[in-house]
Amino acid sequence: WIFDSPDQAGEAFRQFIKQCYQANGFVNGGVTIGDREVHLGMIEMPVLNIFAEQDHLVPPDASKALRGLVGKTDYTELSFRGGHIGIYVSGRAQKEVPQTIHDWLDQR
């Protein structure tokens, strides 16, 4: 599945890597969409941050950092047992994650 993505235009890919990864533009500023600069502090809607407790690709501490970066006070973190893929495909996740998302949305 890693290799199932479409080809990317070289310059667009370079710009994405430079702005999003190297410069951390959504945190530090510098990302422009259309004619508007955007960053995480501009988020004005409720945020539900779901992450896997045993994720080896996106460690929980990397996910938890979002709390201090978004501009919204309605912020919820939910962690689930599992790894990077297991949080989406395991039987337990299939029972727990969708219901949790439903409940969170229903409260808003």
Regions found by a protein language model. Give the residues of each.
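Alpha/beta-hydrolase
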Residues: 1-39, 45
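Short beta-strand/loop motif that positions the catalytic acidic residue
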Residues: 43-44, 49-51, 55
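Short alpha-helix in the alpha/beta-hydrolase fold that links the catalytic acid
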Residues: 45, 59-69
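Catalytic histidine-centered segment of alpha/beta-hydrolase-like enzymes
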Residues: 57-60, 77, 81-96
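Mg2+-dependent phosphoryl-transfer active-site scaffold
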Residues: 72
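C-terminal alpha-helix
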Residues: 100-108
